[in-house]
Amino acid sequence: MSPQTETKASVGFKAGVKDYKLTYYTPDYETKDTDILAAFRVTPQPGVPPEEAGAAVAAESSTGTWTTVWTDGLTSLDRYKGRCYGIEPVLGEENQYIAYVAYPLDLFEEGSVTNMFTSIVGNVFGFKALRALRLEDLRIPTAYVKTFQGPPHGIQVDRDKLNKYGRPLLGCTIKPKLGLSAKNYGRAVYECLRGGLDFTKDDENVNSQPFMRWRDRFLFCAEAIYKAQAETGEIKGHYLNATAGTCEEMMKRAVFARELAVPIVMHDYLTGGCNATTSLAHYCRDNGLLLHIQRAMHAVIDRQKNHGMHFRVLAKALRMSGGDHIHAGTVVGKLEGEREITLGFVDLLRDDFIKKDRSRGIYFTQDWVSLPGVLPVASGGIHVWHMPALTEIFGDDSVLQFGGGTLGHPWGNAPGPVANRVALEACVQARNDGRDLAIHGNEIIREACKWSPELAAACEVWKEIKFEFPALDTFV
């Protein structure tokens, strides 16, 4: 050891282990406008004080480790460390706390959701001193927001490209999700678009399997789009899933979609990765393609109430990393989603400025400045009887995406989209006339059945179908 090293090591350094809270719990800290703020739901192990648990989260997700290290003296911990600045108990839950942590902006690479997540939701989630840990929300400062380009186009450009205004957009996921040949798949796309839908969609499972290679699917779907557009006079689209085993292959598929002059491609955001999403978003922005985002695998991360990460965090990250649409649950369908919680993250996707509202799970005021908005997609176990509720809950700036609720029509593929379009038009007209969809929804659908046999047949098939289970994702 050199004399210089000996001198530095001997001044102010004491080896050993000390409580995290001595360094990382700072209840008097005043947060800065440039800090990234996090709200964690912390469940400490028995005997671990909540302040120590919150400080451990702040430490292990920023500059700290389990013991003091000599190299702490070579930097400024006060400048770079995360700080647990508040602890509050979770009402109605034993031994659960909300720990508020502030992170200096210099800890994060500009324009990188991957780097942000690597720090904030990294190894700390396996920390033994915690029984469980869940990231409930993040406040992204405007200084960091401005380092991202966000969605390739956003809501207004989406509508302008389609030339469709004043109502939700209407879509359908092609079923069965696996097993169709490319030609039969294209036929289903054509029948749906011809019947009145704005979009059809590849299921997230569809990539390039032996029964249907991606290039064949792209060609037959493009043919279906052109034919439906010519016959209806409306602009149509199909979400061509560009997700692949490598980013290079993904980009090759996106390039081929652009060469076919289709309006939109699709990517599996979580299974494909944030980096791939951002790369594809940049390409879509430069080449005039809309980007639809699927959230497959999200429930592995966000379903459990005490561990993981809430979907509102994933939604914020997607808006930063880039996507024009993202699936957001339905409230009324087969997938998990409580109304107020869902509307909270829907606002985080669409609006420019969202105020703190704990009743909807929004822990921090969020200012997106000029970052474009994202269209929420309601999809999963919905049918024509749900149309009034979906229109009332999600409003015009949304995509209502039916799968079995279109292709399960008793008369076949073609009448299904007709029934959905009639139901949507009836609900929008009734709403515009001042009728309350929450009160008169079923009556509005029954009235429309009188002049649409396709809708009447659909209503008869699905009149008893409900998905009524208690939501796990409720705010306490």
Swiss-Prot record:
The modification N6,N6,N6-trimethyllysine is found at residue 14. It comes from the Eukaryota. The disulfide bond which can form in the large chain dimeric partners within the hexadecamer appears to be associated with oxidative stress and protein turnover. Its EC number is 4.1.1.39. It is an enzyme of class 4 (lyase). Its cofactor is Mg(2+). HAMAP family: RuBisCO_L_type1. RuBisCO catalyzes two reactions: the carboxylation of D-ribulose 1,5-bisphosphate, the primary event in carbon dioxide fixation, as well as the oxidative fragmentation of the pentose substrate in the photorespiration process. Both reactions occur simultaneously and in competition at the same active site. This is Ribulose bisphosphate carboxylase large chain. It comes from Barnadesia caryophylla.
